[in-house]
């Protein structure tokens, strides 16, 4: 049965209710600084750590709990006679529970213009020491670093005569070690990102030592292939709009490939302001469209490549209503994603329990970095988050684009960013007409896109084409023009740009350059 708890928290969420409940169970509460003041002001009996140890807080609060009477009471093993004897000899009572969360270092350094002095003053020393001491001796000490665990601990204490199960203690200890590792990792990342000048005015996005922290969501039946094992991890606090914030409403457990494809679909669809639908297969869009409604967007997207859409991932950037749900339900789909689902849509898919429905709040989440593992190393880059605007486009052909061509070109360019390189995308009237992806030759991607359109019964006459990188020769342009394209958008930047521009003028084709490349591997 616990007799004494030490509570010292930066995040005061729920601490009054928690401390009051402990006090009601007869637990003596030790505390420091602001936490002690808050408890006392609210009528909760509390002993200041300085009074408990007989040693005052000092150095502007830098030294509060770094004392043998605190750490001895935490670290002593109750089943070791030598430890118990040492406590008795030095008059050190045991501390049976430690409730600590840390100075907000990560929030501090995330602020614009954060100074090194601000960062230093938000590095917690005593807190991590107490947490680690408690977690090390978790057999005898209940340790809590997260306010969301208060209710479970109180429930067990009430139900088990002031005791908490070993399983809960061990789970809380694991959480503490993960928390302190993340905390120290954030400090390391910050310090190793600073320049060596005395003002530390420069701060790199790529620290000399990189620490990453992710929490496991689930283990999966297998990875990309059945002989591979896999698990899904997420950041501690994903941004609003990130895939990791999904809520699964129904369906089978998500697979490794489901999550990879769902991310590709969601990242693409949320870039559109209009009601949009994206159909993904093997991380490539096989149909993208905008429309006046989710139903119209889906119907147009499906036309691009209905064969490849079979068993795909479908994402919407609007609530999926009953009309769209009825249409989608006719198609075999693995995962369906939307910001929300109407009650009618939920009813329709309730009869198709294998279909995974994911709700994700819309938002502008962008990963701080993209990662790619290589043998013995890690490639790190900023995400490809650039969206070209009209003012940045350069018309390089003699022929000027019409408003409709500009609209089609911008749509095609937006889609091409999400197609594996080499990427060629034919579009018209807010829908993809043919997608050529992942070929070693840009000409082959153009030919495949043309074949796809032909197979779907779509005419490419008058279409707009986007290429994710420049045309190194005129031959790629000749292929898309021969297929029916009358306007083309690409980054430019080739030593043969003029040759390609001349070819466009020769064939009366509109050509725009973006100055931005969108390789995707």
Swiss-Prot record:
Name by which UniProt lists this protein: Bifunctional purine biosynthesis protein PurH
Single Gene Ontology MF annotation: phosphoribosylaminoimidazolecarboxamide formyltransferase activity
Entry EC number(s): 2.1.2.3, 3.5.4.10
Domain-level remarks: The IMP cyclohydrolase activity resides in the N-terminal region.
Keywords (A to Z) from UniProt: Hydrolase, Multifunctional enzyme, Purine biosynthesis, Transferase
InterPro entries per UniProt: AICAR_Tfase_dup_dom_sf, Cytidine_deaminase-like, MGS-like_dom, MGS-like_dom_sf, PurH-like
Catalysis: reaction(s): (6R)-10-formyltetrahydrofolate + 5-amino-1-(5-phospho-beta-D-ribosyl)imidazole-4-carboxamide = 5-formamido-1-(5-phospho-D-ribosyl)imidazole-4-carboxamide + (6S)-5,6,7,8-tetrahydrofolate; IMP + H2O = 5-formamido-1-(5-phospho-D-ribosyl)imidazole-4-carboxamide
Start and end residues of each MGS-like domain: 1-145
Top-rank taxon: Bacteria
Family of the protein in this entry: Belongs to the PurH family.
GO BP: any one term: 'de novo' IMP biosynthetic process
GO terms for cellular component: cytosol
A Pfam family assignment: MGS
Source organism (scientific name): Janthinobacterium sp. (strain Marseille)
UniProt entry tagged with the keyword Hydrolase: yes
Pathway assigned in UniProt: Purine metabolism; IMP biosynthesis via de novo pathway; 5-formamido-1-(5-phospho-D-ribosyl)imidazole-4-carboxamide from 5-amino-1-(5-phospho-D-ribosyl)imidazole-4-carboxamide (10-formyl THF route): step 1/1; Purine metabolism; IMP biosynthesis via de novo pathway; IMP from 5-formamido-1-(5-phospho-D-ribosyl)imidazole-4-carboxamide: step 1/1
């Amino acid at each position: 049965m616990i007799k004494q708890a030490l509570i010292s928290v930066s995040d005061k969420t729920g601490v009054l209710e928690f401390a009051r409940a402990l006090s009601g169970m007869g637990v003596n509460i030790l505390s420091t600084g602001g936490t002690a003041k808050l408890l006392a002001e609210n009528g909760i009996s509390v002993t200041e750590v300085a009074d408990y140890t007989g040693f005052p807080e000092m150095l502007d609060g830098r030294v509060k709990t770094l004392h043998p009477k605190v750490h001895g009471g935490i670290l002593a093993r109750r089943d070791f006679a030598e430890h118990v004897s040492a406590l008795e000899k030095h008059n050190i009572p045991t501390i049976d529970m430690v409730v600590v969360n840390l100075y907000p270092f990560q929030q501090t350094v995330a602020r614009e213009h954060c100074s090194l002095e601000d960062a230093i003053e938000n590095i917690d020393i005593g807190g991590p020491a107490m947490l680690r001491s408690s977690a090390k001796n978790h057999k005898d000490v209940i340790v809590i670093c997260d306010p969301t665990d208060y209710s479970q601990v109180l429930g067990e204490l009430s139900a088990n005569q002031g005791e908490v199960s070993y399983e809960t203690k061990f789970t809380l200890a694991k959480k503490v070690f993960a928390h302190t590792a993340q905390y120290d990792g954030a400090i390391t990342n910050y310090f190793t990102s600073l320049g060596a000048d005395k003002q530390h005015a420069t701060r790199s996005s790529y620290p000399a030592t990189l620490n990453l922290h992710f929490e496991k969501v689930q283990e999966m039946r297998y990875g990309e292939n059945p002989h591979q094992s896999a698990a899904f991890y997420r950041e501690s606090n994903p941004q609003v709009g990130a895939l990791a914030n999904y809520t699964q409403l129904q369906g089978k457990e998500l697979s490794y490939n489901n999550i990879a494809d769902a991310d590709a679909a969601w990242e693409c669809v949320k870039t559109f302001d209009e009601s949009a639908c994206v159909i993904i297969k093997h991380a490539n869009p096989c149909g993208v469209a905008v429309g006046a409604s989710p139903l119209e967007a889906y119907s147009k997207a499906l036309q691009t490549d209905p064969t490849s859409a079979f068993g795909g991932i479908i994402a919407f950037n609007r609530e999926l209503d009953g009309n769209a749900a009825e249409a989608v339900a006719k198609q075999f789909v693995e995962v369906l994603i939307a910001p929300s689902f109407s009650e009618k849509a939920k009813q329709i898919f309730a009869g198709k329990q294998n279909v995974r429905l994911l709700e994700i709040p819309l938002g502008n989440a962008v990963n701080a970095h993209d990662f790619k593992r290589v043998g013995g190393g890690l490639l790190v880059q900023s995400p490809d988050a650039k969206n070209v605007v009209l003012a940045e486009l350069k018309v390089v052909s003699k022929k000027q684009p019409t408003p409709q061509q500009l609209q089609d070109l911008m749509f095609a360019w937006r889609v091409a960013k999400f197609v594996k390189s080499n990427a060629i995308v034919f579009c018209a009237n807010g829908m993809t007409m043919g997608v050529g992806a992942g070929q070693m030759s840009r000409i082959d991607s153009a030919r495949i896109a043309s074949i796809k359109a032909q197979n779907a019964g779509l005419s490419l006459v008058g279409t707009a084409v986007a290429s994710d990188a420049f045309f190194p020769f005129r031959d790629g342009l000749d292929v898309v023009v021969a297929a029916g394209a009358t306007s083309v958008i690409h980054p430019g930047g080739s030593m043969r740009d003029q040759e390609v521009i001349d070819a466009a003028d020769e064939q009366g084709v509109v050509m725009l350059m973006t100055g931005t490349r969108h390789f995707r591997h």
